């Protein structure tokens, strides 16, 4: 499974003094993408967080976006909302949050 693979990889990378981070799966607009469910995303994120060893730092962008807001109306797709891709503003917000967590 995914967590086992990451845990195995972490042992090799921490032996080389690497700092390890993982970012949660982000929310989607289920009104536009009904095949994806928020409960499944939350479940995956929770299982991964519980199963990963202590070598990882979690960047919980899912909770950040749920708290601060996001939009999946994408400029690159003619301002359409496919439920999966974000606006440029949201992508920049995710990037800034991740950099802040890493530093």
Regions found by a protein language model. Name each.
Residues 26-103:
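Catalytic His-Asp segment of secreted/periplasmic serine-dependent ester chemistry enzymes
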């Amino acid at each position: 499974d995914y967590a086992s693979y990451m845990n195995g990889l972490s042992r090799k990378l921490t032996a080389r003094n690497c700092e390890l981070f993982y970012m949660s799966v982000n929310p989607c607009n289920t009104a536009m993408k009904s095949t994806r469910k928020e409960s499944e995303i939350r479940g995956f994120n929770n299982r991964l967080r519980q199963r990963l060893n202590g070598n990882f730092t979690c960047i919980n962008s899912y909770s950040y976006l749920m708290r601060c807001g996001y939009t999946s109306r994408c400029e690159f797709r003619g301002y359409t909302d496919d439920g999966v891709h974000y606006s440029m503003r949201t992508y920049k917000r995710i990037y800034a949050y991740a950099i802040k967590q890493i530093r």
